């Protein structure tokens, strides 16, 4: 929806949007708490309340001590005993604080982790139960990854120790005021009048910053979507040298984030500055008022002073609770889309379960349009009967609606009118899981999950036995290649099955459907990816499987469906004609006969080919995949140049370009920090003046109040400078690091993306989390460090000047205070890295299941996915309990030492006064300054291990940035005046992920300039590996590959790829318009060039028929287009590039016969005077090639033109032809 251009309307709309920013109530975040969580929260709350209330109790003792010490010059001996007694009370109080703070942290951390895990599972469960149409129109994989990576972490942060922290401060606030009113109500009342101003300043800051943070997060979602899509289609991006364009898009998406982040920095500076401004003015008022209370004898100096301290610190607790409130608000906003999804009403999927399934399917007056394109009518009053136990074939043009009929039977979509019936029952009223449980589906583009072959087959039947799995693999002819794998069924297939060839993926996909033993079988080009020999065997296996089952086959190759009981020609939203093969060909003017004639004309010499063959994605053509062991042994081996350490200097070098901002921020931080000890000195001076004569008290109070008023103005300025400059620096760092990481990812060779740890979901997740972590360490923590450094330096200078003896004693307790903090931090840090890795695996699983949602729901695998997801969350959940216990104990110990040290300091101060070595004034001033210092000293030094060990937390950032690609391409010569002669000379090659498996050994191939070379052979023989080597997706282990006599390793990589066009078997489109997808072939091409390319690829007519034409969005991974439409867009993209060398990997495989004929003609024109390498299973498409090479086991076993090769009747090529001809006549 585009915003209005009217500024007034825009402002009103923005204000309204800000006002109505959606969020959920805070209590709703705890919706998933069970009884055990409630017990944990109750115990944690009790601990937090006792911990918070202990501080005001401390001030009661403190007030009595002050009074004793203040009057010690009258009765020194007696005073010393009393001080010792109260100092011991401090120790008892410290023990209470130890246990209560442990309970607070341990319980809240554990319950937070437990509840967040349940929210994660509920979110994914809801996602998996949504209607498929939602994924066409509203939800992207990037959105899901962002929600699970970031948003739920924000919620987890808000429902764990942050709640304990908040209750701690609130109980301190309540207890402080209660004790204050009981002690000196007059002072408490004046203080109470100030608290609303403090709370208001904190509240406004929290509200503004939370609004900006929501906007920042929304911007990140868009950037995440771009990253996930680009990395997922990295082969296409690299083949079309689109890396810079991708980085530019990503940077554009991040620019909004940067703008909002800068505003958040300014808001934080003004917010915290205003908070301190109010505090300074409040203290000036209170010091003056307390002096009057003491003068009039309402209360003594110690009591009055500690009441004032107590009430102000209680008020301050509201300020300290403000960041927690901000976290709660942020979580409420972040949780809105999550809970909205969890509670989203899906249509009731329960229903009747039939006792027996015959398999009669009826389309009754079915009208249908896709939700994403409601203007385009696919079916209008469609009526069709699929009898039980029969094989029904659907044929017709690409985009005619064949696959849509399968989607309607699977109930991926509901008809807009009419009904789909099963055995006389409207399938809308049948239980959805039960329905899908009786249907087996094999798609044209097989979808596998990044797990083992065994697990992939078990998606068909979760409790399948080893025997059932093996039998299914035998039936699909997958067993032969699986047995050749080092790890057999336990072999990892990689993201989207990338480690396997297309034929191997399809066979596993068929095994998955077979193991299900369904009543209804839906085959959408099920044998399309197989070579002729495998196809024959698999087709026979499928024929056996089809017996007695209702089977619906979608096919472009008519030869595959000759024996179907019924063949239906789909077109124009209706069934044009139907009948058996013999019945249909008896009508020479019929649609089927017309299609048959077109196909026969395409391959007269071969009498047809039966398959819609597909070879593979352009790389892992071979039969061996990456195994878990080989990943660690080999794939990671080149990356062993990991930096063992990332120095602090290296961390800070990242912000060198922004040193001016850093300098201003450092100055602001140092001044802001140094204000606190000076403030404490002013308060201590006021306290001392309460024990002097009235005139002296008045003068001192007046002087201190004026200084505080000046300080209030300075604090606003320095806080604004500090947070604005560091905010800008932090956002610039994040922007720079994300951009560098993204560029570094795209710089890597294709082999790097084959690794299990480098899937698109995991890398997109890392881009989001790692850059933010680096910013937190380098900028956010440095801000606190510098501020507290200013505080500590100023405090020690003042303390040593005032009373060096007392300072040294207090300083001696600091190691104990700090050790607790440091231990806690180191302990937490040790868990941090491992936990983030555990979540990465879970995030990858979630992203993968959403991107393959159709396969998941078709196989009723939602529960399987959720079980796997739960297992991935088990480790962080188990660790959270131990982590919470240790963190709680260490936190409690550090609190114990802090309060015990106060008792020691006051006791020692009284001894010094007793011996006449110190005055009351110097003791109180030193003590007050050191109290403030001790409160933050632990925090400062606890940051040190984070900064020093920051390399462990962000090492992955630098690993990525420092990694040298194994295919170096930024040096070398430019390739110009390309003639196009390709030569592979003595090539030895094995994939980096499986170095033990040799693909080529002394492989030689020459493709003369301007000639076409076809590569044929069985699936997994190495055909697509040739294309991958020419494109330099991989480098050979030995031998050279030359273009026009130049070693391609000595050429600039982008220069090489600019002259090569690629069309893959599974076309990779981007989630943008058709126009933008075609334009990807040639940046800056004119509109007429784009349209001409579309016409050549036979895409213009179907594009023009769409309501939005070339502006039609193709959806994530081109899901809104049919397979044939996607392929034609991909061909148009290659046509537009107009390359000297053309690589076609089953370029016409997804097209119907009519489209294929026209596109083949277009490709023939395109191939003229151009060096072309064609990979094909279907021999009819390559009979006109200048040369044909038959590849088997990584070697060329026969080579020549079609006419020469067919003369050798016993040759491999002739055998392939006769096999396909036999299939044509006896399918």
From Swiss-Prot:
Disulfide bonds: none
Keyword Secreted found: no
Binding residues for ATP 1: 396-403
A Pfam entry, by short name: ABC_tran
Description of what induces expression: Regulated by the transcription factors NAC045 and NAC086.
Residues bound to ATP 2: 1017-1024
ATP-binding listed as a keyword: yes
Subcellular location: Membrane
Glycosylation sites per record: 758, 834
GO cellular component term, pick one: mitochondrion
Residues covered by the ABC transmembrane type-1 domain: 41-330, 662-949
UniProt membrane topology term: Multi-pass membrane protein
Tissue expression pattern: Expressed in the sieve elements.
Transmembrane segments: 38-62, 90-110, 169-188, 194-214, 269-289, 297-317, 663-683, 704-724, 784-804, 806-826, 889-909, 927-947
Alphabetized UniProt keyword annotations: ATP-binding, Glycoprotein, Membrane, Nucleotide-binding, Repeat, Transmembrane, Transmembrane helix, Transport
One Gene Ontology term of the molecular function aspect: ATP hydrolysis activity
Gene3D superfamilies for this protein: ABC transporter type 1, transmembrane domain, P-loop containing nucleotide triphosphate hydrolases
Domain named ABC transporter: residues: 361-597, 982-1218
Quaternary structure, from the entry: Interacts with 1-naphthylphthalamic acid (NPA).
Family statement: Belongs to the ABC transporter superfamily. ABCB family. Multidrug resistance exporter (TC 3.A.1.201) subfamily.
Protein name (database record): ABC transporter B family member 10
GN (gene name): ABCB10
């Amino acid at each position: 929806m585009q915003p209005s251009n009217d500024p007034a309307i825009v402002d009103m709309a923005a204000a309204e949007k800000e006002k109505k920013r959606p969020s959920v109530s805070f209590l709703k975040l705890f919706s998933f708490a069970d009884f055990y969580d409630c017990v944990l929260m109750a115990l944690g709350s009790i601990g937090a309340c006792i911990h918070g209330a202990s501080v005001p109790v401390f001030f009661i003792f403190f007030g009595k001590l002050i009074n004793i010490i203040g009057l010690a010059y009258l009765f020194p001996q007696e005073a010393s005993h009393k001080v010792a007694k109260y100092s011991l009370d401090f120790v008892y109080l410290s023990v209470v604080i130890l246990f209560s703070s442990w309970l607070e942290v341990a319980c809240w951390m554990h319950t937070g982790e437990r509840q967040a895990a349940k929210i994660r599972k509920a979110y994914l469960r809801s996602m998996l139960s949504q209607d498929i149409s939602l994924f066409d129109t509203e939800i992207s994989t990037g959105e899901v990854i962002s929600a699970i990576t970031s948003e739920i972490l924000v919620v987890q942060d808000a429902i764990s120790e942050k709640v304990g922290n908040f209750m701690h401060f609130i109980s301190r606030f309540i207890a402080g005021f209660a004790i204050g009113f009981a002690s000196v109500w007059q002072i408490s009342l004046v203080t109470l009048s100030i608290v609303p101003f403090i709370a208001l300043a904190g509240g406004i800051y929290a509200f503004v910053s939370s609004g900006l943070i929501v906007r920042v997060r929304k911007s990140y979602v868009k950037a995440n979507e771009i990253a996930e899509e680009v990395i997922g289609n990295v082969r296409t991006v690299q083949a079309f040298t689109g890396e810079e364009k991708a980085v530019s898009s990503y940077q554009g998406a991040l620019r909004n984030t940067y703008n909002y982040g800068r505003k958040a920095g300014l808001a934080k500076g003004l917010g915290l500055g205003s908070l301190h401004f109010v505090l300074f003015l409040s203290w000036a008022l209170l010091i003056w008022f307390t002096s009057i209370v003491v003068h009039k004898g309402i209360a003594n100096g110690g009591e009055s002073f500690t009441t004032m301290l107590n009430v102000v610190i209680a008020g301050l607790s509201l300020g300290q609770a403000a960041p927690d409130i901000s976290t709660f608000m942020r979580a409420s906003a972040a949780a809105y889309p999550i809970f909205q999804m969890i509670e989203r009403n899906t249509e009731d999927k329960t229903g009747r379960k039939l006792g027996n399934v015959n398999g009669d399917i009826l389309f009754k007056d079915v009208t249908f349009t896709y939700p994403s394109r409601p203007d385009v009518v696919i079916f209008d009053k469609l009526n069709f009967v699929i009898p039980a136990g029969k094989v029904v074939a659907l044929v017709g043009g690409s985009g005619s609606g064949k696959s849509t009929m399968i989607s309607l039977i699977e109930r991926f979509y509901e008809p807009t009118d009419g009904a789909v019936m099963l055995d006389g029952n409207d399938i809308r009223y049948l239980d959805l899981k039960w329905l899908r449980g009786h249907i087996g589906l094999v798609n044209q583009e097989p979808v596998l999950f990044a797990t083992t072959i065994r697990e992939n087959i078990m998606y068909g039947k979760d409790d399948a036995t080893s025997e059932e799995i093996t039998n299914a693999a035998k039936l699909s002819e997958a067993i032969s290649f699986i047995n050749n794998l080092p790890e057999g069924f336990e072999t990892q297939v990689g993201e989207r099955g990338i480690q396997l060839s297309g034929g191997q993926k399809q066979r596993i996909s068929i095994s998955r459907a077979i193991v299900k033993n369904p009543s209804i079988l839906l085959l959408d080009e099920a044998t399309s990816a197989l070579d002729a020999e495998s196809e024959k065997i698999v087709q026979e296996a499928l024929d056996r499987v089809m017996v007695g089952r209702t089977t619906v086959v979608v096919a472009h190759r008519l030869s595959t469906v000759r024996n179907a009981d019924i063949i239906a020609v789909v077109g124009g939203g209706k069934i044009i004609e139907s009948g058996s093969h013999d019945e249909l060909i008896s009508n020479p003017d019929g649609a089927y006969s017309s299609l048959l004639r077109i196909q026969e004309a395409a391959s007269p010499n071969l009498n047809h080919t039966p398959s819609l063959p597909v070879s593979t994605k352009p790389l892992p053509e071979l039969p061996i995949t990456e195994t878990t062991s080989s990943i660690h042994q080999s794939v990671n081996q080149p990356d062993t140049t990991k930096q063992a350490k990332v120095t602090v200097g290296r961390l800070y070098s990242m912000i060198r370009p922004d040193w001016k901002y850093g300098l201003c921020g450092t100055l602001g931080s140092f001044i802001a920090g140094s204000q606190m000890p000076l403030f404490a000195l002013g308060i201590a001076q006021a306290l001392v003046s309460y024990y002097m004569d009235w005139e002296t008290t008045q003068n001192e109070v007046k002087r201190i109040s004026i200084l505080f008023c000046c300080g209030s103005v300075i604090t606003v300025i320095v806080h604004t400078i500090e947070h604005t400059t560091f905010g800008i620096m932090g956002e610039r760092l994040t922007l720079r690091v994300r951009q560098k990481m993204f560029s570094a990812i795209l710089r890597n060779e294709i082999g790097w993306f084959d690794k299990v740890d480098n899937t698109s979901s995991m890398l997109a997740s890392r881009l989001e989390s790692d850059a933010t972590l680096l910013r937190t360490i380098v900028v956010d923590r440095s801000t606190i460090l510098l501020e507290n450094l200013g505080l500590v330096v100023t405090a020690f200078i003042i303390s040593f000047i005032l009373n060096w003896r007392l300072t040294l004693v207090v300083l001696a307790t600091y190691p104990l205070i700090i050790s607790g903090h440091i231990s806690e931090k180191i302990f937490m840090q040790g868990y941090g890295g491992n936990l983030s890795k555990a979540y990465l695996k879970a995030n990858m699983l979630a992203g993968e299941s959403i991107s393959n949602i159709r396969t998941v729901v078709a196989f009723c695998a939602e529960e399987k996915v959720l079980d796997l997801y739960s297992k991935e969350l088990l480790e962080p959940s188990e660790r959270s309990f131990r982590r919470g216990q240790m963190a709680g104990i260490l936190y409690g110990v550090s609190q114990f030492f802090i309060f015990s040290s106060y008792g020691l300091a006051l006791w020692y101060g009284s001894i010094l006064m007793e011996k006449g070595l110190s005055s009351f004034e110097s003791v109180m001033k030193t003590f007050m300054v050191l109290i403030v210092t001790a409160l933050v000293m632990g925090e400062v030094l606890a940051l040190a291990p984070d900064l020093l060990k920051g390399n462990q937390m962000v090492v992955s950032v630098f690993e990525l940035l420092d990694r040298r690609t194994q295919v170096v391409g930024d040096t070398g010569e430019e390739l110009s005046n390309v003639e196009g002669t390709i030569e592979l000379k003595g090539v030895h090659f094995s994939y980096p992920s499986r170095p033990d498996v040799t693909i080529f050994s002394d492989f030689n191939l020459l493709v003369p300039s301007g000639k076409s070379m076809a590569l044929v052979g069985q699936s997994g023989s190495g055909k697509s590996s040739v294309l991958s080597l020419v494109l330099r997706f991989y480098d050979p282990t030995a031998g050279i590959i030359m273009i026009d006599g130049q070693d391609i390793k000595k050429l600039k990589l982008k220069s090489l790829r600019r002259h090569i066009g690629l069309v893959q078997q599974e076309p990779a489109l981007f989630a943008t318009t058709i126009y933008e997808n075609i334009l990807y072939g040639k940046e800056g091409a004119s509109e007429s060039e784009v349209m001409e390319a579309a016409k050549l690829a036979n895409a213009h007519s179907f594009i023009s028929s769409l309501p939005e034409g070339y502006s039609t969005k193709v959806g994530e991974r081109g899901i809104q287009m049919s397979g044939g439409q996607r392929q034609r867009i991909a061909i148009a993209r290659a046509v537009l590039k107009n390359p000297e060398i053309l690589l076609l990997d089953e370029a016409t495989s997804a097209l119907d016969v009519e489209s294929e004929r026209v596109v083949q003609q277009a490709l023939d024109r395109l191939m003229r005077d151009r060096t072309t390498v064609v990979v094909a299973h279907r021999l009819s498409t390559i009979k006109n090639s200048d040369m044909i090479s038959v590849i088997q086991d990584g070697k060329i076993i026969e080579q020549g033109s079609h006419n020469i090769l067919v003369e050798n009747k016993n040759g491999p090529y002739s055998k392939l032809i006769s096999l396909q001809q036999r299939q044509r006549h006896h399918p």
